[in-house]
Design a protein with these regions (language model features):
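A compact, surface-exposed functional segment
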Residues: 46-80
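Residue-level signature for short turns and capping positions that connect secondary-structure elements
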Residues: 49, 97, 111, 132-133
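Short helix/loop capping segments that flank catalytic or ligand/cofactor-binding pockets
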Residues: 43, 114, 135-136
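Secondary-structure transition/turn motif
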Residues: 127-136
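Hydrophobic residues embedded in beta-strands of well-ordered beta-sheets
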Residues: 42, 123-125
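Short, Lys/Arg-enriched N-terminal segments with co-localized hydrophobic residues
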Residues: 1-12
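A generic "binding-loop/recognition-motif" signal
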Residues: 39-40, 48
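Aspartyl protease catalytic core from the pepsin/retropepsin fold
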Residues: 12-39, 70-120
Length: 137
């Protein structure tokens, strides 16, 4: 996530990137995770999927736009993974994105779903443990 502040003729940017524990049916691993509210969905690099979870083929290939004008990336697989923030168990779907520059990215949909707050001043993540409690009504 990039948060910018204008100072004179330059911008100051803040990034939050933390190691998170990811857990799948095949194992678990800490991945350095970028929190990016500019990314719609959460993503994971293909190199880290094999030992975590079996990827599921998407019904239709998704073509994601990149920052390069006119450039797209084809995404064919998705995985569902559990992950921990401050010892709070959360879960979501991650697109398996070839050529991803990060190990994992938590996007806006996941941030909103779990009401994750980003504290740039203290470089920390805030998640209410109550959001992870399952309720059956």
């Amino acid at each position: 996530l990039l948060l910018s502040s204008f100072v004179g003729k330059c911008y100051l940017m803040s990034i939050i990137k933390h190691p998170l524990l990811y857990v799948g049916s095949k194992g678990e691993k800490y991945l350095y995770t970028l929190f990016d509210s500019g990314a719609n969905l959460s993503c994971i690099h293909p190199d880290f999927v094999e030992n975590l979870e079996t990827p599921v083929l998407l019904g239709r290939v998704r073509r994601l736009l990149t920052a390069s004008e006119g450039a797209t990336i084809e995404v064919k697989h998705v995985v569902r993974l559990d992950f921990y923030i401050n010892d709070v168990l959360l879960s979501d779907e991650f697109l398996v994105v070839p050529g991803l520059t990060e190990e994992a990215i938590i996007g806006a949909a996941t941030l909103q779903k779990w009401r994750i707050k980003l504290d740039f001043e203290h470089d920390r993540l805030i998640v209410d443990p109550k959001v992870s409690k399952m309720q059956i009504i």
